[in-house]
């Protein structure tokens, strides 16, 4: 992990999450965010076409693939160039993927039990 993406997010004080159904719209929004100085942005994986956007945007930005809940999604996003990934829920298998591939993972928690297990 040569870059500290989590530190960049903290320094930028903003973490944009792009949720679009169309890859082209996602790419245009990402370009505008980067032109505005954003260093890390999240692209939520709404559907399979969004991997195309991750692949394109990762050429000019640090992309976090968001909404990842399966190992197949994580692998696909990382293969497309995502530098980190996030999930709306806590799953230990996502932590294992993060450690094995040496990429940051931002875990969400929807319940007290999920938060406790993540701790």
Regions found by a protein language model. Give the residues of each.
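Conserved N-terminal beta1-alpha1 strand-loop-helix module at the mouth
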Residues: 1-81, 100
């Amino acid at each position: 992990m040569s870059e500290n993406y989590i530190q960049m997010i903290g320094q930028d004080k903003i973490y944009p999450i792009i949720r679009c159904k169309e890859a082209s719209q996602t790419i245009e929004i990402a370009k505008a965010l980067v032109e505005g100085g954003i260093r890390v942005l999240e692209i939520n994986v709404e559907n399979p076409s969004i991997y195309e956007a991750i692949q394109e945007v990762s050429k000019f930005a640090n992309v976090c693939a968001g909404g990842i809940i399966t190992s197949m999604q994580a692998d696909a996003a990382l293969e497309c160039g995502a530098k980190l990934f996030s999930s709306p829920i806590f799953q230990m298998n996502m932590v294992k993927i993060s450690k094995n591939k040496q990429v940051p993972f931002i875990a969400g928690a929807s319940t007290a039990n999920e938060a406790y297990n993540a701790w």
